């Protein structure tokens, strides 16, 4: 393989989706688990490895699958359990970005690694509320550390807060005096008027599909020059939920620029 490293993760136990997809490729692989923040996490780690001179090319990739996630985190589909209004629909999708050391094209120019944030949300069917404070904390840290503002970006993308989580994030930003037009992959990926997905999409493959599909295509066409991609992850497990534990969350932010 021509790849020096692959950074990959997914939602299945022990990240078997990623390891199975790479097991016959001969690629040096680092497995990740950041839940729905995995695409952003893999991007920033791949960029760091190249920037530090440890790799010439690196792959950032992730995936998710609706039925397997339902079975693992909630109920098997055959059970017929009723979904709550705050729940989100795990996207069956995947995304992969190949990074190199070139000077032209779309580049990763900065990143903010998020801290774990836990505001006491215990409902596994309300991940947007658990993740929104983490998104706020990372955005606040990003603007503060890099001395930048929301208007410095053509678009700010989160993934995947869903409708409720997005409303909470906008409220937190407004309360802090930050005016930002933040769009969410979980809201963008489905047509909620025609598809009953409750609060929208979720899963590693949700933000990965939106980023690697329409967003990077818009950057390549010159419609977007500077994009802030904020991957949010609810770091729960089935066991922690069953034991009544609250849901820790994290958000990593990556700046993509078209030269």
Language-model regions: role of each:
Residues 1, 43-45, 130-145, 210-215:
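Short, well-ordered amphipathic alpha-helical segments that serve as non-catalytic structural scaffolds
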Residues 33-60, 99, 202-223:
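Active-site-proximal alpha-helical scaffold in enzymes
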Residues 76-141, 145-148, 179-196, 229-232, ...:
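Condensing-enzyme catalytic core mediating Claisen C-C bond formation in acyl metabolism
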Residues 134, 140-172:
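Long, repeat-rich segments with strong aromatic
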Residues 8-9, 58-64, 99, 227-232:
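Short beta-strand segments
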Residues 17-19, 44, 69-74, 121, ...:
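Short acidic, glycine/serine/threonine-rich loops at helix termini
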